[in-house]
Every structure is written in C-alpha cells, then in structure tokens.
Regions:
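Active-site neighborhoods and metal-handling regions in enzymes and metal-associated proteins
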Residues: 1-538
Length: 538
C-alpha cells in the first residue's frame, strides 16, 4: 500500500516512531468533510468511527462493535489489522504503542484534529513509558496529493418561522450561562452548535446542513469565522442585525492570540488542541461541557411543531413506500440499491425536503446484521419474497430532521426470526411506554429496552437512543439512551430515538422518533413520558 509506505518515509524524515489518524476534523464532529477524512485515506476503512495507527513496521485500526464486520472486509489486503475496541483482549492504542515502541520515541498527531481530552489521556499513558507526542505535523498536507478542498458551499438563513428564536436572544442566553460559570467567553467549534446559534444552515457536510466555521463569543462580541465567499448579502445583513461580526475562517488563530478577556470556557472533549495552544497563557481556562449543546437539545414550541409536521410528511412517504415494497419484491428485480432510490424519490416529493439525514441502510438477510451497512454495486443484494429487510433511513426537511427504522418481513419467517423480532419489539414498546421523573438519565432507562432480550441471553452492543437535531445533525447530544455513557438528564422538549436491536440474526431493529414532555395528568409529580412523533406502522 503505497500510502503507508510514503507515510513511513515521512516518519523517518521527521524522527517519528508512529502517527495516529483519528476520525475527526478541526470541529470534532461525527460526520466530517472529505478534506479531513485522513483515517479513511490512509486505511481504506470508511466507517464513521475508528482510529488508525501506523508505525515503522506495523499498522492497526481500532473501531467499535458497529463496524467489526465491515472493517474486517474493508481491511483485507491492506497493511492494517483490526483491533476490536472495547472487547476483552484488545489493547488500547496507548497499551499497544507502549508495548511496541521503545522509550524515547515520539508519536505524531495533528493538533487541529485531536481533542484536548484525547491527547491528555494518551499523553498520561505514553509518558509513563517515556514516549512523547508531537502535535505540530500534518503528513496529509504533504502526502495526500489528490486531497479534496475545504468545502465552500453557500450559507443560507434558517428563518424565524422554523427556528422560533432570534440568534441575538440565543447569544444572550449563552452569555448568561457563561457568566454563571465564571467565564468571560467561549469558542464554539462544533458545526451544528454554530449553525443553531446563528440561525444559519449550509451543505458542507454530507447529509448534515452545517457549514465550516468557528464562533467566538464574549460578553461584548460575537465573531463568526467563515470564508467570506460563503455569505450572501442577506446573510451578512442578518448577522449584523443580530450583533454578529464576521472574519475569515483562517483568522481564528490570530484572534485567539489577541484574546484579552480574563477567561474562556472550553469543552475539552470537543475542542481541538490547537485552539487551546493559541490562547494567551494569561487566559484562565474554564473547562466545562458545552453549554450550547443542552440549549440546542431542548426544542422550543416552533421546533417541536416543525418536528411533528416533518415527521408527518416523512411518514406519508414511508407508508407509500411500504405499500409499494412487498408487491414489488414479489414481482422480482428489486435490490437494496433500487429500493433506496425509490424511497428517496418518495421523500423528495414531499414539501420542504432538502436531503436525506444519513446514508440509507437497506440490508437484506445477512446484511441486516451489519450495523451501518451501506449497499454498493459489489454488495447490492437482490430482494426475495422471504426473510427480513432492514431499512434504516431519514430525511432533512427545513422544519425538522427524521430518522426511522423498520424491519420488514418480505415473506415466510423462521421460528428464530419470529422470536428475535418479538423480543426487539417488546423492548421498543417497553421504552416507549416509560414514565420517569424529572432528572432521569438515558443510562437509567436503557435497561427497559434490553430486558426482554437479556432474559433470553441476548444483548446488543450499540446504543438504544440518541437525540435528533432540528434541521441539523441526525445525532445530537448531550442526552442518549445507552448503557455506558456520561449521564445527561432528559428534559421536556428533547427528542430521542427508541432503537433496540438484535444483530445475532437478520432481525435487526425498529426505530421511531419520540419527544419528551410533561405528562399533564401527573405534572404535580414531575412525571415525564415519550409521546411518539412519527406516524408509521411497524
């Protein structure tokens, strides 16, 4: 693999023993523009999560359980071996490097695409073995000769009729939260947080209506760092009216060096190392989780109304698709990719449709057990009138984002398939019917979705539910429903999915969108519930 060979020459020239490629960009998001997909470029693995490490004579890729099957297939014939992250017997990256490299070695990482927390954690472990970290190098700028450019698509307004709150008021709320935490400002680097605060949308990231930018907010100023060519006159006028200045994207380092406020809040779990390094040493760093994330997660009345309207239209498209599907399969000729195109066309005919919210997962038979499977011309399976079809899909409408999964029986099922389907459905219903007190976290509710399967010795390794943006990213925090995750209270106005699964057979999972609201009949007891937002039969 010439890319790995070229990288090893680079390592020798720079006196580095290894280089680490994470699955992040300078904004530390889940989905990243092609310009920063360095891990995929060096390894060939295209999953959304994973870390590649290359040394002078070895190469390995760590990824989680969602991608074990896909990674094994995609890494065949490459220098990389698969490390099944989180599984017993799999070393961490730090353990592997400490056992592989001699004391005095230096490991390279690009400071722009590695978070403060991830580097600190690795640094502590490597330091014990006398191994250092160099954050100053980016081999891709030299070796990636056909590297895609940084996206420069236009930025558009997200009108008040869909956002429900002016940007100036969101900034006022943000400043109040910062003041309460003893911070004079903050750097917002997550693209969905910038887009939400500014009431702007873009198309720089596949399936996510965001744009490449940073936002620096102090008590007196708000500065949006973005390529000026992306902004039309209407956007400039809107920002000026909201009290927001604009500067070129590349000017952020200089602005940070000139930062004269006493303190700045940084979410070290989602802020890259270089942002911290450019701030003056006299600046006090307030390390705290993002205060924008929980603000964004609690939807206002306009956003909730938009969610319901978007899901109603999406439900119409889904019901039309399901009515078409079984007769079409019985007639023959349909494949995973052809039904994907059909569903896209039905969604695209709905008002306010803008895009899909993630690449559709249409997995027939064994493909349904591959988490985040995506059909390609070489894997495109023909659909037969038997067994299960997993269909996980969603759309971006200007008034809301959708995400729905259905596991569809295309014909006769085995007894095992019926049992598995029933267990997953029982978990889905048990969670959907939950009543819970104010302050409960997703980690406490997760067992409801798993209980029926646990009684049969079955478990699934992925999360059960995630938040969903409002015409933004389909995955949103800080709240989630899963076993192992930092707790975040579920609050009225949040949206969350309900998607238990069984990937031991072709029966996979169901999913529907739920919102969280106070139960009006039990409000005095502060009870909450999950009223369904999505209308589509199971």
């Amino acid at each position: 693999m010439t890319r790995v060979e070229d990288l090893r020459r680079f390592l020798r020239e720079k006196d580095l023993a290894a280089f680490i490629f994470p699955s992040t960009d300078p904004h530390c998001g889940e989905y990243i523009p092609a310009h920063w997909q360095a891990r995929q470029w060096i390894s060939g693995f295209n999953g959304s999560a994973g870390t590649a490490v290359v040394t002078a004579d070895d190469a390995a890729l760590w990824t989680d359980s969602r991608y074990f099957i896909a990674a094994e297939q995609q890494l065949q014939g490459t220098p990389f071996r698969l490390m099944k992250d989180g599984m017993q017997g799999t070393p961490t990256i730090a353990q592997w490097l400490c056992s592989t490299l001699p004391s005095g070695s230096r490991v390279g990482m690009d400071g722009w695409v590695n978070t403060i927390d991830s580097v600190r954690s690795l640094e502590r472990e490597l330091d014990a073995s006398g191994i250092g970290i160099d954050l100053s190098l980016d081999p891709c700028s030299q070796l990636w000769t056909e590297r895609p450019t940084v996206p420069d698509n236009p930025v558009v307004l997200h009108p008040i009729e869909f956002s429900g709150e002016e940007s100036s008021h969101k900034l006022q709320r943000l400043r109040h939260a910062l003041s309460a935490l003893g911070a004079d400002g903050t750097v917002v680097s997550q693209l969905d947080e910038v887009a939400w605060l500014m009431n702007l949308r873009g198309s720089d990231v596949h399936c996510n209506p965001v744009f490449v930018s940073y936002l620096l907010v102090t008590m007196q100023r708000a500065i949006l760092f973005v390529n000026p060519a992306k902004l039309g006159d209407d956007v400039r006028e809107y920002l000026a009216g909201q009290g927001v200045e604009t500067m070129p994207y590349a000017d952020l380092p200089h602005a940070l060096q000139e930062y004269r406020e006493g303190s700045v809040l940084l979410d070290t779990s989602s802020t890259n190392c270089n942002i911290l390094s450019y701030l003056p040493k006299t600046c006090r760093i307030v390390e705290h989780p993002s205060v924008v994330s929980p603000m964004k997660a609690v939807k206002n009345e306009t956003e909730i109304r938009g969610f319901r309207q978007a899901m109603l239209r999406d439900g119409v498209a889904m019901v039309k698709f399901l009515r078409w599907l079984v007769p079409a399969v019985q007639a023959g000729g349909e494949t995973e990719m052809s039904i994907d195109r059909k569903l896209y066309s039905l969604r695209a005919s709905q008002p306010l449709f803008r895009d899909i919210s993630f690449d559709t997962i249409a997995g027939y038979a064994a493909h349904g057990a591959i988490v985040h499977y995506e059909a390609t011309p070489s894997t495109d399976a023909s659909l037969m009138p038997r067994g299960f079809l997993l269909l996980d899909s969603g759309a971006q409408y200007q008034d809301g984002t959708t995400d729905i999964t259905r596991t569809i029986a295309l014909g006769p099922l085995t007894d095992r398939e019926r049992t598995d389907y029933t267990l997953v459905l029982r978990g889905h219903i048990r969670l959907a019917m939950a009543r819970f007190p104010e302050g409960a976290c997703g980690t406490q509710l997760d067992v409801l979705a798993r209980y029926a399967m646990w009684q049969h010795g079955i478990n699934y390794l992925h999360g059960t539910g995630h938040g969903v943006g409002s015409y933004l990213n389909v995955h949103e925090g800080p709240h989630q429903i899963r076993m192992n995750y930092k707790p975040a209270p579920l609050r009225a106005g949040m949206t969350v999915t309900d998607e238990p699964g069984n990937h031991y057979t072709e029966c996979s999972y169901f999913k529907r969108k739920l919102s969280i609201k106070n139960n009006p009949y039990q409000k005095k007891d502060e009870k909450h519930s999950f009223p369904p937002c999505y209308i589509c039969h199971i």
